[in-house]
Design a protein with these regions (language model features):
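N-terminal beta-strand motif that seeds the catalytic metal site of vicinal oxygen chelate
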Residues: 1-18, 66-67, 120-127
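Vicinal oxygen chelate
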Residues: 3, 7-15, 45-47, 58-127
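Core segments of cupin and vicinal oxygen chelate
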Residues: 5, 11-51
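A short linear hydrophobic-aromatic micro-motif
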Residues: 31-32, 52-54, 89-93
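Residue-level structural signal for beta-strand termini and adjacent loop
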Residues: 38, 58, 117-119
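Short acidic/glycine-enriched loop/turn segments that link adjacent beta-strands
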Residues: 38-41, 63, 97-102
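Short, charged/polar, Gly/Pro-enriched secondary-structure boundary elements
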Residues: 49-53, 111-114
């Protein structure tokens, strides 16, 4: 479908809304949008973009999800250091020749697999 230009919203289930908010707002620095107290939802934005991440509290069993945030190659190393300083276990950076891109991987408190991905113009030599 040619009308699709990107991802606008991703909703993920979380066991504890306040714990998830502490991670996504406090550790990753996302911006708070609408918080629906009665439905236990919180809409978050990243970097001033129109796209949103929605945290939905769910007390039932649910599978983990994977999603990626875009960043720049210059920020990948610094982001990994900052996450580690905040107690987050980080894997990478890993270079993906086929994209090309460099990524780091980590998990949120609910076990969702997260990625910071930096698209590259070309694969760096020796990668």
């Amino acid at each position: 479908m040619t009308a699709i230009r990107g991802i606008y919203e991703v909703a993920i289930p979380v066991e504890n809304l306040e714990r998830a908010e502490a991670f996504y707002l406090g550790v990753l620095g996302l911006e708070s949008g609408l918080r629906e107290t009665e439905r236990r939802w919180h809409f978050l934005r990243a970097g001033g973009s129109a796209g949103m991440l929605v945290l939905q509290e769910n007390t039932g069993s649910f599978p983990s999800q994977h999603f990626a945030f875009t960043t720049s190659d210059a920020e990948i190393e610094r982001a990994g250091v900052e996450l580690r300083e905040r107690g987050v276990e980080v894997t990478g950076p890993v270079t993906h020749d086929w994209m090309p891109a460099r990524s780091i991987y980590f998990s949120d408190p609910d076990g969702h697999d997260l990625e910071l991905c930096a698209p590259l113009d070309e694969v760096p030599p020796g990668a």
